[in-house]
UniProtKB/Swiss-Prot annotation:
GO biological process: one example: venom-mediated perturbation of sensory perception of pain in another organism
Disulphide linkage map: 61-72
Naturally occurring in which organism (per UniProt): Apis mellifera (Honeybee)
GO cellular component assignments: extracellular region
InterPro entries found in the cross-reference section: Secapin
Name this polypeptide is given: Secapin-2
Localization annotation: Secreted
One example GO MF annotation: serine-type endopeptidase inhibitor activity
Prosequence residues removed at maturation: 33-52
Length: 77
């Protein structure tokens, strides 16, 4: 006679592992579907970066020089 308890234990282990795997995978799929069902404006609002306010301040030049054409130039008298 075959050992049916060993086969049953193996079958229960496989079924339990499959059930736990489904419990982990299905919620993530549902979340992805719910994100796709949002209006396009709501999804693109998350993707658009906020504009950065860049203030163009010229660098400080050493004494006796002047900032000309994006560089510090020494003024010759």
């Amino acid at each position: 006679m075959k050992n049916y308890s060993k086969n049953a234990t193996y079958l229960i282990t496989v079924l339990l592992f499959s059930f736990v795997t489904m419990l982990l995978i299905i919620p993530s799929k549902c979340e992805a579907v719910s994100n796709d069902m949002q209006p396009l404006e709501a999804r693109t609002a998350d993707l658009v970066q906020q504009p950065r306010y860049i203030i163009d301040v010229p660098p400080r030049c050493p004494p006796g020089s002047k900032f000309v054409h994006k560089r510090c130039r020494v003024i010759v008298p």
